[in-house]
């Protein structure tokens, strides 16, 4: 729901990116979406395995994981 994000900074989550499951830590919460997407919160997620920051990942594509990879 816009303005009420499911995840918070520091949560560990996973999502699919180009057919691959990526696990990472939420670094930024955009509670009201972004410039091009205002229907749901989005997140900037850092994956240490890939050494990559994935920006503006929509909440509907993200799932919380209960462990730190």
How would you label these PLM feature ranges?
Residues 42-69:
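Intrinsically disordered, low-complexity, charged/polar segments
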């Amino acid at each position: 729901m816009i303005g009420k994000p499911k995840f918070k900074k520091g949560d560990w989550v996973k999502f699919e990116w180009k057919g691959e499951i990526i696990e990472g830590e939420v670094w930024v919460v955009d509670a009201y979406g972004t410039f091009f997407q205002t229907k749901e919160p989005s997140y900037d997620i850092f994956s240490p395995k890939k050494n990559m920051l994935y920006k503006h990942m929509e909440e509907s594509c993200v799932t919380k994981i209960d462990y730190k990879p």
